[in-house]
Amino acid sequence: MKLINHIPDVTNVLTGHGPGFVLLNGQRIEHSMVVSPEYILREWAPDFSSLKENHFEQLLILKPELVLLGTGAVFRFPHPALTSCLINAGIGLEAMDTQAACRTYSVLASEGRRVVAALLIP
C-alpha cells in the first residue's frame, strides 16, 4: 500500500508497506528496524518476544517526544517493565500493528514532530 502522495521534507520516509515489509526511502526492508526523520537503526529486536528493556533504552539517545512501536501483524502491548525508561524520561509510547505505525509515523514526521518508529517486521 502506498502511504503518501508527496515526499515530506524529512530525510527518512516510509513510503509503503505490505505483509512482511516496509518501504523506507523507496527501499524494501524485510527486517525489524528503528527509524526517525534523521536516523535509521537497521537492526533491532527481531520479533515481539525478543523485546528487552535495552531495546527501548537505545531509543533514548534519539530524544523523541513519541515512540511508535509497530508490533508486527497484530497489536500487542509490551510489559511496562520493558518501557519504563521511556515513561521515566517523559517520552510517550504508542503501540500498534506495524502497518498502523508506518502510517502514523509518516503523518507525524511530515508535521515536523520528533517521532521514532520502532518497527517489528517478522
Segments from the language model and where they lie:
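Short glycine-/small-residue-rich flexible loop motifs, especially phosphate/cofactor-binding loops
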Residues: 19, 83, 105
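Short active-site-adjacent helix-start/loop capping segments
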Residues: 42-44, 75-78, 104
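Mid-chain, well-packed structural core segment of small domains
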Residues: 59-95
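Non-catalytic interface/targeting segments
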Residues: 1-53, 62, 110-122
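Short, charged beta->alpha transition segments
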Residues: 52-58, 104-105
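Short beta->alpha connector loops
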Residues: 51, 73-75, 99
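C-terminal structural segments of small proteins and small subunits
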Residues: 90-120
